[in-house]
Design a protein with these regions (language model features):
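Conserved SAM-binding strand-loop segment of SAM-dependent methyltransferases
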Residues: 137-147
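Class I SAM-dependent methyltransferase "Motif I" SAM/SAH-binding loop
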Residues: 94-98
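Conserved SAM-binding loop of SAM-dependent methyltransferases across substrates and taxa
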Residues: 99-112
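Active-site segment flanking the S-adenosylmethionine/decSAM binding pocket
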Residues: 146-180
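S-adenosyl-L-methionine
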Residues: 1-82
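C-terminal substrate-binding/active-site "lid" region of AdoMet-derived donor-dependent transferases
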Residues: 168-219
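Conserved SAM-binding motif I beta-strand of class I
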Residues: 116-121
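Conserved SAM-binding loop
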Residues: 130
Length: 225
């Protein structure tokens, strides 16, 4: 696994997006790792994976979400559901190195909440990095599983699902069919948004900006409101 990240990566960002993206990336991702002494900000291209798990061809390479997106989206759902928020499990589909789980845990501690947090990641090496980053936080369950092999009971409890463009349309359709409870979808970099909209979802809130990392939508199923 390639763990190198440095000045050349920032130069590439600058060349494509100007100064704005390197600044965002440093404060949203790189500095976060430095302050928390963890490893989440380095992306992992498909060609750099050490192994090819089930449905590897359907997956998208690893990249960390921005801090502000993770915090903003969960706080919006919290505000919408108010006292009912405590009933939801928080589930990151394609949890990678565990950044979303890490920030969720801090958010729950801040608000004195005890929601169950679950991360589902099909790549073993990324799951192992997440485990080290999370340092055995006792309110987080990590599952090294492909979405198709994830037990049905995970999808039978009310949940808030976080997806950072983890896979293509085929797996999204399978995922939608598997959910059997009241839920919200937080979709960061929503490449296949229309697949959700075509399956009876509605947009609760959204945001679009200069880079896909800042694009997100919050969705819910119309007939489960």
């Amino acid at each position: 696994m390639n763990n190198h990240f440095g000045i050349n990566d920032y130069k590439k960002m600058f060349k494509k997006y100007g100064i704005k993206l390197p600044v965002y990336y440093f404060f949203e991702n790189h500095l976060f790792d430095i302050l928390n002494k963890i490893d989440t900000h380095k992306r992992l291209l498909k060609s750099e994976y050490s192994s090819k798990p089930i449905n590897f061809n359907e997956g998208v390479y690893y990249m960390a979400s921005f801090n502000s997106v993770i915090k903003k989206t969960v706080s919006i759902v919290h505000a919408l559901e108010s006292e009912e928020f405590v009933k939801y499990n928080l589930i990151d589909i394609g949890s990678g190195k565990g950044k979303v789980l890490f920030i969720w845990s801090k958010y729950l501690n801040k608000h004195k909440l005890q929601n169950k947090i679950i991360g589902i990641e099909y790549d073993l090496e990324l799951s192992e990095i997440a485990s080290r980053n999370l340092n055995n936080k006792n309110n987080i369950q990590l599952l090294n599983l492909d979405i198709e092999n994830t037990p049905d009971y995970i999808f039978e409890e009310d949940a808030i699902y976080y997806l950072y463009n983890p896979f293509g349309e085929k797996i999204i359709k399978f995922f939608i069919d598997k959910i059997n409870s009241k839920h919200f979808i937080i979709y960061n970099n929503p490449v296949h948004l229309n697949t959700f909209l075509d399956n009876n979802y509605e947009i609760v809130k959204n945001n679009y900006d200069f880079h896909p990392n800042l694009d997100w939508v919050i969705l819910r199923k119309k007939n489960l409101i």
